[in-house]
Regions:
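Eukaryotic phosphoinositide-binding membrane-targeting regions
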Residues: 1-27, 31-140
Length: 140
């Protein structure tokens, strides 16, 4: 795989990406000096490239779940799950600061909105219960 303009891979992990319709897709998340790449592990093809300069913020809950959202105002957002969520977000913050001297906003909240597609906004909320952490989605 050729990452044009990128000099090094800073982080890689297997993630679950949630589509606008709520389906889960396995993806390989690759973070380089300048972009996020999502790779389909079955076809080994790139499904999406997002320049880090386009990322406004990363949202994650205050609970010990695996969910996070990457907010991209010029496109639809990414809602994903990773067992290495905290590490992934920290590396994104560090890489963004190094590449552009910009402090990437990290929103810690048990409720936030994201654009699941060009025309669909979803609100996700996280709640701790006796059974574990409950995740709820609401179409806006």
């Amino acid at each position: 795989m050729n990452f044009v303009g990128d000099t090094s891979i800073r982080f890689a992990d297997k993630v679950l990406k949630f589509t606008g319709s709520g389906k889960m897709k396995r993806r390989i998340f690759i973070l380089t000096d300048f972009a996020i790449y999502l790779i389909d592990p079955e076809t080994e093809g790139m499904t999406r490239r997002i320049g880090l300069a386009a990322v406004e913020k990363v949202c994650l809950s205050k609970l010990s779940d695996n969910f996070f959202a990457v907010i991209i105002p010029t496109e639809y957002d990414l809602f994903m799950a990773s067992t290495r969520k905290t590490e992934l977000v920290q590396v994104m913050v560090d890489v963004t600061k190094t590449a552009s001297d910009y402090d990437l906003e990290v929103l810690l909240s048990n409720r936030f909105e994201y654009n699941a597609s060009a025309s669909l906004v979803k609100e996700v909320s996280f709640e701790e219960s006796e059974e574990g952490i409950k995740t709820r989605f609401k179409w806006k």
